[in-house]
Curated annotation (Swiss-Prot):
Gene3D superfamilies: Glu-tRNAGln amidotransferase C subunit, N-terminal domain. HAMAP family: GatC. Keywords: ATP-binding, Ligase, Nucleotide-binding, Protein biosynthesis. Allows the formation of correctly charged Asn-tRNA(Asn) or Gln-tRNA(Gln) through the transamidation of misacylated Asp-tRNA(Asn) or Glu-tRNA(Gln) in organisms which lack either or both of asparaginyl-tRNA or glutaminyl-tRNA synthetases. The reaction takes place in the presence of glutamine and ATP through an activated phospho-Asp-tRNA(Asn) or phospho-Glu-tRNA(Gln). Its EC number is 6.3.5.-. This is Glutamyl-tRNA(Gln) amidotransferase subunit C 1. GO terms for biological process: glutaminyl-tRNAGln biosynthesis via transamidation; regulation of translational fidelity; translation. It catalyses: L-glutamyl-tRNA(Gln) + L-glutamine + ATP + H2O = L-glutaminyl-tRNA(Gln) + L-glutamate + ADP + phosphate + H(+); L-aspartyl-tRNA(Asn) + L-glutamine + ATP + H2O = L-asparaginyl-tRNA(Asn) + L-glutamate + ADP + phosphate + 2 H(+). Belongs to the GatC family. The gene is gatC1.
Length: 95
């Protein structure tokens, strides 16, 4: 499997990025190099290799949710730069 210029353009379009032709060629070469390395790794025989386990036990540290008193709505609205009744108005960020 190889990455074509069209693939690079498609991913750039999805990410809403624009690149020069030279940059597209560079990305295409880099991605093809990475995929070549992955292909080499897939050729390795790992049937007789022991499973590697992380020696450190990692555990999520969760805390109990505790209800705390929050600011009064009037104070929140008073500190907001712009409001519409009980709502804070923010700039639109998504088209």
């Amino acid at each position: 499997m190889s990455v074509s210029k069209k693939d690079v353009e498609y991913v750039a379009e999805l990410a809403r990025l624009s690149f020069s032709e030279e940059q597209k060629e560079g990305f295409m070469e880099d991605l093809n190099s990475i995929l070549g390395y992955v292909d080499k790794l897939s050729e390795l025989d790992t049937d007789n290799v022991d499973i590697i386990v992380n020696p450190y036990y990692i555990e999520n540290k969760f805390r109990e949710d505790e209800v705390e008193e929050s600011m009064d709505l009037k104070d929140v609205i008073k500190n907001a730069p712009k409001n519409l009744e009980e709502y804070i108005v923010v700039p639109k960020i998504i088209d």
